[in-house]
UniProtKB/Swiss-Prot annotation:
Its EC number is 3.1.26.3. This is Ribonuclease 3. It is found in: Cytoplasm. Homodimer. Coiled coil: none annotated. Mg(2+) binds at residues 54, 127, 130. It comes from Helicobacter pylori (strain ATCC 700392 / 26695). The lineage of its organism: Bacteria, Pseudomonadati, Campylobacterota, Epsilonproteobacteria, Campylobacterales. NCBIfam families: RNaseIII.
Amino acid sequence: MKNKRSQNSPYITPNSSYTTLEKALGYSFKDKRLLEQALTHKSCKLALNNERLEFLGDAVLGLVIGELLYHKFYQYDEGKLSKLRASIVSAHGFTKLAKAIALQDYLRVSSSEEISNGREKPSILSSAFEALMAGVYLEAGLAKVQKIMQNLLNRAYKRLDLEHLFMDYKTALQELTQAQFCVIPTYQLLKEKGPDHHKEFEMALYIQDKMYATAKGKSKKEAEQQCAYQALQKLKEAK
């Protein structure tokens, strides 16, 4: 979908209405302003953006996905359930779900973010997905969010189980670099920002003193996992 810049606005906005997005989501917003807020990144510097909704969405999705996994995998102990939830409730997991409904095509971002392909960044896309689900929760309640999430998980994942869903990318990368280069990756904190309840960490990954990836996450561990995933993809492409 092509996006355009309004003459009276500093941000990029989609050409079409949100009807296609709502159809893919399986929910039509009564208050379109709430939907628009959920899709508005802070880079637009508008009075309302999706940060507060993102905060609520994080809590709502943690509960919804936790309950879904609790009932679906009755044979799993707390440790396995935590791993499953962590793989979905993450920037990588929410980005995957967001792309299942082409959410990136509807984000409102600044012109500078548009130039840097910001609408494809996991940190921006996953936050918008959390905000979108918070909007659904505020209008239609928890049951509707549960129904939407069940449908999206079925669409985004061919199989929803521990073996196919959870991947420790850091461990996989370490095993690969030890085999290929006889070294292990190192991680460095580049930036830490935000209040204590809403931290964002940016990490860099190095292999033999060469930077292979940078990524952001709500914890150092999540950002490191994202870095490891990127590095694995680069090493696979280089083969």
